[in-house]
Amino acid sequence: MYHVTKSKEKLWIIIAGLAIGVVASVLVLLGNPKNMGFCIACFIRDTAGALGLHSAGAVQYVRPEIIGIILGSFLLAVGKKEFSPRGGSSPMTRLVLGFFAMIGCLMFLGCPFRMILRIAGGDLNAIFGLVGFAAGIGCGVLYLKRGYSLKRTYRLPASEGSALPVIAAALLVILVAVPSLLKFTTATEENPSPGPGLFRAEIWISLLAGLVVGGLAQRTRLCMVGGIRDAILFREFKLLLGFAAICVSALVMNLILTAVTSGTYFTLGFESQPVAHMDGLWNALGMLLVGFACVLLGGCPLRQLVLAGEGNTDSALTVVGLLLGAAFAHNFKLASSGAGPTDNGKIAVIIGIIVVIVIGEFNIASNKRKG
């Protein structure tokens, strides 16, 4: 019976990964930036810009995909009676880790989800990110083995657990009904292609895609960090199957779309990749920070959105940390661009790695004192 259940879990994870890869490629076909059908970090950054939290005009748009992931997870959790409002597990630590995870993402120009999609689009620069990501997860696993553990969660009122889904729904209403309250990346005659924020699929298509991905990720517990972490810690590879399935299906879709449309959705190489730079060292270090921070958080940015939809206020606070990190990165020129990383960004990544190490050491020391 156990083996049957485990096989069904693996099958669901593979199906979810294949479906998510297809959805991501279709979003690019319908208007999203190349190799960015989904990117949790980039889309939170765009949303921060739309809310006026930063002034980088190239990246301002409330991304319905983020709203959809939160609401998709929320609706499925409620439907399956898995909605469980809880929180109080080292909230400020999670906020800080979320902040620095975003700094790492914007050094690399993508979250773990986009890293996979970049590889599927032929971007070999993302391989450096994958190496750094795995190394960062390895660092985090060492801390887990030494006794790192955040505090237990506590049950909370439903109003607390519903806060982020309600905010997401309110943002959707504003985007559809009162868009004048938001900022948008716009094209001009002088600059007809100002940045990624200009490229987007239709609102309802993006929302539907987010709902599908959010629901599938909630159903399968899909996590980009969890796959590598579990493989190292427990020799358990089922979450890695989802990781691989996304890459394979997105790759196949990109090759098909390149063959049957006038666009180019797969370009193998390092140069001229969309929304990417070629500095391998800083691609690796940025994702090392992401992997390290996310292991200590307990999941990748996608997983944090899904958990927040399920009622976890600690994950909701992590999402706030990601939002603040995105705003800070663009206000203080920490984010990379196609031209490469900035000096400020390099300093921020090094500081971030040090901060994550300090958090880990203090946590282990505190847990040892408590016995």
Regions found by a protein language model. Give the residues of each.
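Membrane-interfacial helix-loop segments of redox and metal-homeostasis proteins
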Residues: M1-G371
